[in-house]
Amino acid sequence: MPKEKARPGETLIARNKRAGFNYDLGDRFEAGIVLKGSEVKMLRAGKADLTDSFCTVLRGEVFLHGVSIAAMASAAFGHVPKGARKLLLHRREIERIDLSIAREGMTAVATRLYFKSGLAKVEIALARGKKSHDKRETIKEQDAEREMRAVVVHGQRGYGRA
């Protein structure tokens, strides 16, 4: 797979590469994220990890769990590196996420963390877990795609592998 680039006007901080492998990703939502000053500084330094992150809905509010933002040593009032963080979404989006989680057995997973117009945003996707045979099929598709790209590259350069 080609490396994902940041979209125009966005600065990519982190992305969850495992989410696409472990889940079938569905609808995506862009959410603001409530942060402390030290968390924003560490995000600007690129010190964040989205692996194993997920969202829960509690009393009409969405919280992001499992995101690791490194602690800042020089911060007077630091933050909890893996604490729950509140997400800012419209009410209809929250209701849709809540229904999908409760009725359809889906999971809300964080896929990308980025700055947009100076504000920290997180992209969450409604996801359904893949079975192990689905994961094996994904690996086969990726290998086939990688081989096709190699043939095209070597064929164009004249190595005689075409």
UniProtKB/Swiss-Prot annotation:
Q: Does the keyword Cytoplasm apply?
A: yes
Question: Which Gene Ontology CC terms are recorded?
Answer: cytosol
- Keyword check for RNA-binding, yes or no: yes
Question: Which terms in the Gene Ontology molecular function aspect does this entry carry?
Answer: RNA binding
Q: Which subcellular locations apply to this protein? A: Cytoplasm
Please name the Pfam families in this protein's record. SmpB
Q: Which UniProt keywords apply?
A: Cytoplasm, RNA-binding
InterPro entries registered for this protein in UniProt = SmpB (IPR023620), SsrA-bd_prot (IPR000037)
This protein's source sits in the domain of life called Bacteria
Q: Which GO terms describe its biological process?
A: trans-translation
What start-end ranges are recorded for coiled-coil regions in this protein?
A: none
Stated role: Required for rescue of stalled ribosomes mediated by trans-translation. Binds to transfer-messenger RNA (tmRNA), required for stable association of tmRNA with ribosomes. tmRNA and SmpB together mimic tRNA shape, replacing the anticodon stem-loop with SmpB. tmRNA is encoded by the ssrA gene; the 2 termini fold to resemble tRNA(Ala) and it encodes a 'tag peptide', a short internal open reading frame. During trans-translation Ala-aminoacylated tmRNA acts like a tRNA, entering the A-site of stalled ribosomes, displacing the stalled mRNA.
What HAMAP family does the entry give?
Answer: SmpB
Family, according to the entry, reads as follows: Belongs to the SmpB family.
Which PANTHER family does the record cross-reference, listed alphabetically? SSRA-BINDING PROTEIN (PTHR30308:SF2), TMRNA-BINDING COMPONENT OF TRANS-TRANSLATION TAGGING COMPLEX (PTHR30308)
UniProt name for this protein: SsrA-binding protein
What's the source species for this entry?
A: Sorangium cellulosum (strain So ce56)
